[in-house]
Amino acid sequence: MLLVVSPAKNLDFEKHSNAPSSSQPELLEHSQQLIDRSRKLSPAQIGSLMKISDKLAGLNADRFAAWHTPFTDENAKQAVLAFNGDVYGGLDAASFSEQDFSYAQKHMRILSGLYGLLKPLDLMQAYRLEMGTKLDTERGTNLYQFWGNIITEKLNQALAEQGDNVLVNLASSEYFTAVKPKALDGEIIEPVFKDFKNGQYKIISFYAKKARGLMARYIIQNKVSDVAKLRDFDTAGYRFSEEQSAGNKLVFLRDEQ
């Protein structure tokens, strides 16, 4: 079973990494092309392209300028510990055992606008480049065109290496759009998390993101290899709904918090 998640906008390069080892991203030559292109943008252009404040635009211009290889433990950090958003709050990789890190390295991948696809222990330097960014390159007018089939091919390689053909999609639609399902050598399982509010169960973004991280943690810590076992997920009050689930979509419900 291979699981994929989105990255996060918020980053944490301050806290010490407790990971037992590190690895190198496999698509850095493509990342370098995006960095070279992004360095040609002024802070004002970055702000306009990413729809962010002047302060953030300046920060990201500085990040593009500072980005350099080779990545080391001194100038970079393992991706699963560097990302710091809602999904990663649920995942809580800082509390992983060495065994958890080892399992995650084989069974988890992080989609990224800059790095394409990351293993949890891949070193990365700080950046902000969301997959939906309309950055024009020699390959097209956006990052989906830039990455083309590259991410899907890497996922197929990871699926083959870890031993079955099940891919659990815990990523947002913005990021999973970079994957080409028809070219994927696997069955896509899509967990959906709904919370009860105002008389009905619905997807509430903050809770759903955290739940995706909790599900990723559940898969990693329990070494889940059977799709049926995903239905046993009951962390933080969620429960599987046979009634609302259909096909490869597994729906989990939670009563009002």
Curated annotation (Swiss-Prot):
It comes from the Bacteria. GO terms for cellular component: cytosol. GO terms for biological process: response to hydroperoxide. Pfam families: H2O2_YaaD (PF03883). Belongs to the UPF0246 family. HAMAP family: UPF0246 (MF_00652). This is UPF0246 protein Patl_3620. The lineage of its organism: Bacteria, Pseudomonadati, Pseudomonadota, Gammaproteobacteria, Alteromonadales.
